[in-house]
C-alpha cells in the first residue's frame, strides 16, 4: 500500500476497447466491506488523474504514485484490495465485461481482526431475524450455511447500539450455533421506544468481508433511494440513514406504533371475484397510498370487490412495477408507511373490498441478503455455493436471480413470509408472479409449460400454508402451463390467470380474425368452475383501447363514441361470463395510452382522470358498473349450477351476432353483441326475456342491435 503501482491493460480482440482510438480512463476504488471507497471520479466524470496513457497496440497504462495510499489520499483506512474498471470517455465501452480486483498488502493499517468463534446454542424459540424477548432484550439470528455445509469465519452485529464498530465483545460478536446453521446474539439494555439501525458484519478471514441487512427486516433504510421519497409519503424523520452504515441497513423498534384495526372482513365468494389490478405509482398524482385511498369510493361505485396491488414489498429503487424485490418482510417506503398500508387495507375492507398482494418468489435482486451472502462478484451473480439461489435459472423466463424452490431453506422462507403478510396486514390472498418458474427442471420455451410434478408439489405446499392461516384467502397463479397441470392446481383450490387479451383486442379493433372468446370460460376445457381469473387486460399486455384507437377498423379508430361503444360490447362478453374476472386500472375509462415496448413498458404512464368527465368514456364506465352490479344483485346466474351457453367464435360477428345466455331457475339473461358496422336483422328473443337491462325498457318479439351495439336482456326488471 505504501509503494507505487503501475496498472497496464492490453485489450483482447473480444474487448470493446480493442481498436479503440479515443481516451481511456481508470475507474478505481479501495474495496472495503464491498464498498468502493475514495473513488477519485464519478463514472461519467473524466479527470486527468484517472486518464490512462496509450502505449499503442491496444495497450494503456497508469501509475498510482508516489504510493497507492498517497494516490488515493486514504489516510488511515486499510488498503487491502482495489476494484478496477477500464472504460472509454462516456462509459459505454469497458475493457472487460466484469470488474477486476487486485489484492494489496497493507503493513501499516490493519482491518478489524475478529476473535475465534464462540459456539453456543441459540435460546429456545429463536427464529432467524429479529426476536423481541419477554424481558425486552432482542436476539438477532441469521443463517449462513452454504450449499456445501460450510459457513463464514465470523459474524458481528454493528449498529446504533455500538457506534457501528465491530468488536470482540458481548455488544458485537455473535455466537455460532452450527446445529442450526446460525450466528446469533442477544442485546440487552435497549431503549424500547427508540428505533435502532444495524447490519451484520461477516466474512472470511482471508477473503471478502460484507455488511448485510437482516432478510427478515420489516423496515430497511436505503442511502441511495430513500432521500428521493417525498416528505408527504414517508416522513424524513423516520428514514434517517446512520453515518456508520454501508449500503442498506435494517431498522427496528421494540415498541412499534400499533395499528388498531377497525373492520372485520372475510372473503365470501372466491369464485365471483371482480379484481381491480392497481399500480400505486400510476394510479394518482401522488403515486402513493394516500392518493389511492381517495379513490376507493370510485372503485366501490365501479362494482369491483377486490383490489390486487402490484408488488409492494421492498424493491430496488423507488420507481418500479415492483417485480424486482429485495426485502420481503418490509413494504416499500415509496408508497407510504407501514401503518398507511394497514389503513389502506382497513378502508378497503370497510367498503367490502378484498385486498390481494402480488408477490414475487421466482427471483430476487442482488440487494437481497441471501444473494449477497454468497455472491460471485466477478460474474455479478449468485455463487455456486449459494444455498438459496440458482446460478442460472433452469427455465427461460427468469430475471435477476432465480430462487431454487427445491431448497428447504427457500420454501421455509416463502412460507414464513406468506404467514407474516396474512397476519400482519390482514390481506385476503395472493397473486403469485411467474409460477411457471418455480421449477428445477432444465427446460426451454418449448418445454417449460409441460406437466411438472415438482412444481405442483411446491405450489401445493405454499397453498397449504395460506389455507392454514386464512382458509378463505385466495391464491392466484400467473402460470400459463399445460391444461393438465392447471386443472390439478385448480382442483386443489388455486386459481389461474387466463389471458384473453389478444381476442378482445381483435374484437375491440373490429377485426373478427382471432377474436374467439371461448378460452375465457372454464367449461370450454372442463376446468374446475371458478378456476380461471379471466381478463381482457393486465399490466403486462397491450391496452385494448390503444389498439382500437391505433388499428381500429373504420369508425372505431376515428370516432371516440363508436370506439367506446365497441369496448362496451367487449366488456359485456367478459363480465357476464361466470367465474372471477380482472380489470387492469382505467380499462373502464377506455385508457388508450400504450403499454409500451418490452424495453420501456415499465416506465411511468400519464394519468387521465379527466376521462371520467368525458361523456363517451363515462358511458363506458357506466356499462362496466351496470354489468358488475348485475353479478351482485343476481348472484344465482353466476353460480356453478347456472346453465351457460354462448356463440363467440369467428363465425359470429355482425349479421349473425355473438350471443350469450345464462339461466338459473326462473332467471334468464341474454346478451347480444354486434361487433360489426351494420345493424343486425331482427332477432327473436328467447322465452322469458322481457326487459332491456341497460335501459329498463320492455321487450317483446324481436329486436335489432345497432352497429357496435349491445343488448343485455333479462327476464327480470333492472
PLM feature segments, named:
Residues 220-221, 257-273, 279-427, 434-451, ...:
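Substrate-binding/active-site clefts of carbohydrate-active enzymes
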Residues 1-11, 132-139:
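Contiguous beta-strand segments within globular domains
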Residues 18-76, 89-100, 141-193, 203-225:
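Aromatic-rich carbohydrate-binding modules that target alpha-glucans
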Residues 399, 434-448, 531-560:
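Active-site clefts of carbohydrate-active enzymes
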Residues 313, 321-324, 351, 434-535, ...:
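Active-site-proximal helices and loops of the catalytic beta/alpha 8
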Residues 193, 706-710:
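Tight coil/turn sites that cap or link beta-strands
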Residues 5-11, 667-674:
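Short, well-ordered beta-strand segments enriched in hydrophobic/aromatic residues
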Amino acid at each position: 500500500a505504501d509503494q507505487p503501482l503501475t496498472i497496464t491493460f492490453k485489450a483482447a480482440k473480444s474487448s470493446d476497447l480493442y481498436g479503440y482510438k479515443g481516451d481511456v480512463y481508470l475507474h478505481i476504488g479501495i474495496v472495503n466491506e464491498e464498498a468502493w471507497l475514495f473513488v477519485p471520479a464519478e463514472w461519467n466524470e473524466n479527470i486527468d488523474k484517472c486518464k490512462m496513457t496509450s502505449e499503442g497496440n491496444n495497450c494503456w497504462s497508469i501509475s498510482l504514485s508516489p504510493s497507492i495510499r498517497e494516490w488515493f489520499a486514504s489516510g488511515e483506512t486499510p488498503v487491502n484490495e482495489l476494484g478496477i474498471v477500464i472504460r472509454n470517455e462516456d462509459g459505454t465501452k469497458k475493457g472487460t465485461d466484469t470488474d477486476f480486483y487486485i489484492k494489496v498488502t497493507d503493513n501499516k493499517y490493519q482491518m478489524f481482526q475478529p476473535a475465534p468463534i464462540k459456539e453456543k446454542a441459540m435460546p429456545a424459540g429463536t427464529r432467524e431475524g429479529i426476536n423481541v424477548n419477554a424481558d425486552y432484550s432482542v436476539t438477532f439470528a441469521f443463517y449462513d450455511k452454504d450449499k456445501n455445509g460450510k459457513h463464514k469465519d465470523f459474524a458481528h452485529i454493528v449498529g446504533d447500539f455500538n457506534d457501528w464498530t465491530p468488536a470482540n465483545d458481548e455488544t458485537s460478536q455473535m455466537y455460532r450455533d452450527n446445529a442450526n446453521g446460525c450466528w446469533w446474539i442477544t442485546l440487552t439494555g435497549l431503549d424500547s421506544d427508540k428505533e435502532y439501525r444495524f447490519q451484520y458484519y461477516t466474512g472470511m478471514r482471508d477473503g471478502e468481508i460484507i455488511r448485510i441487512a437482516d432478510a427478515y427486516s420489516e423496515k430497511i433504510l436505503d442511502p441511495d433511494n430513500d432521500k428521493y421519497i417525498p416528505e408527504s409519503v414517508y416522513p424524513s424523520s423516520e428514514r434517517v440513514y446512520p453515518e456508520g452504515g454501508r449500503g442498506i441497513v435494517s431498522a427496528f423498534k421494540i415498541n412499534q406504533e400499533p395499528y388498531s384495526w377497525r373492520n372485520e372482513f372475510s372473503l365470501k365468494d372466491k369464485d365471483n371475484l371482480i379484481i381491480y389490478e392497481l399500480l400505486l405509482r400510476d394510479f394518482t398524482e401522488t403515486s402513493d397510498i394516500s392518493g389511492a385511498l381517495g379513490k376507493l369510493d370510485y372503485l366501490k361505485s365501479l362494482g369491483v370487490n377486490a383490489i390486487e396491488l402490484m408488488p409492494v414489498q421492498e424493491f430496488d429503487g423507488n420507481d418500479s412495477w415492483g417485480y424486482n424485490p429485495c426485502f420481503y418482510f418490509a413494504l416499500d417506503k415509496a408508497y407510504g408507511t407501514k401503518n398507511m398500508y394497514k389503513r389502506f387495507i382497513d378502508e378497503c375492507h370497510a367498503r367490502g373490498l378484498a385486498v390481494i398482494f402480488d408477490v414475487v418468489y421466482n427471483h430476487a435482486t442482488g440487494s437481497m441478503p441471501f444473494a449477497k451472502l454468497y455472491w460471485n462478484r466477478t460474474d455479478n451473480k449468485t455463487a455456486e455455493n449459494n444455498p438459496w439461489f440458482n446460478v442460472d435459472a433452469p427455465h427461460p423466463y427468469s430475471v435477476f436471480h432465480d430462487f431454487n424452490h427445491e431448497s428447504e431453506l427457500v420454501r421455509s422462507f416463502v412460507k414464513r413470509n406468506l404467514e407474516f403478510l396474512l397476519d400482519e396486514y390482514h390481506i385476503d390472498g395472493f397473486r403469485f408472479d411467474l409460477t411457471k418458474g418455480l421449477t428445477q427442471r432444465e427446460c426451454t420455451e418449448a418445454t417449460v409449460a409441460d406437466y411438472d410434478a415438482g412444481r405442483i408439489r411446491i405450489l401445493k405446499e405454499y397453498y397449504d400454508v395460506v389455507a392454514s392461516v386464512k382458509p378463505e384467502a385466495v391464491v392466484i397463479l400467473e402460470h400459463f402451463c399445460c391444461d393438465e397441470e392447471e386443472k390439478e392446481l385448480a382442483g386443489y383450490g388455486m386459481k389461474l390467470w387466463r389471458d384473453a387479451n389478444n381476442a378482445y383486442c381483435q374484437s375491440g379493433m373490429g377485426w373478427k380474425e382471432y377474436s374467439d372468446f371461448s378460452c375465457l370460460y372454464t367449461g370450454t376445457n372442463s376446468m374446475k368452475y371458478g378456476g380461471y381469473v379471466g381478463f381482457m387486460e393486465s399490466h403486462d399486455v397491450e391496452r385494448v383501447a390503444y389498439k382500437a384507437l391505433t388499428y381500429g377498423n373504420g369508425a372505431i379508430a376515428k370516432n371516440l363514441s363508436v370506439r367506446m361503444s365497441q369496448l362496451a360490447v367487449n366488456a359485456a362478453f367478459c363480465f357476464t361470463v361466470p367465474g372471477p374476472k380482472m380489470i387492469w386500472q382505467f380499462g373502464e375509462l377506455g385508457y388508450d395510452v400504450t403499454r409500451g415496448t418490452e424495453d420501456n413498458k415499465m416506465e411511468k404512464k400519464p394519468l387521465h382522470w379527466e376521462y371520467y368527465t368525458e361523456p363517451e368514456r363515462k358511458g363506458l364506465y357506466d356499462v362496466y358498473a351496470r354489468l358488475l352490479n348485475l353479478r351482485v344483485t343476481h348472484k344465482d346466474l353466476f353460480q356453478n349450477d347456472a346453465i351457460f351457453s354462448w356463440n363467440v367464435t369467428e363465425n359470429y360477428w355482425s349479421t349473425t351476432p355473438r350471443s350469450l345466455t345464462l339461466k338459473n331457475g326462473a332467471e334468464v339473461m341474454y346478451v347480444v353483441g354486434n361487433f360489426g358496422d351494420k345493424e343486425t336483422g331482427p332477432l327473436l328473443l328467447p322465452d322469458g326475456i322481457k326487459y332491456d337491462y341497460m335501459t329498463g325498457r320492455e321487450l317483446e318479439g324481436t329486436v335489432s342491435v345497432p352497429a357496435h351495439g349491445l343488448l343485455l336482456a333479462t327476464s327480470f326488471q333492472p
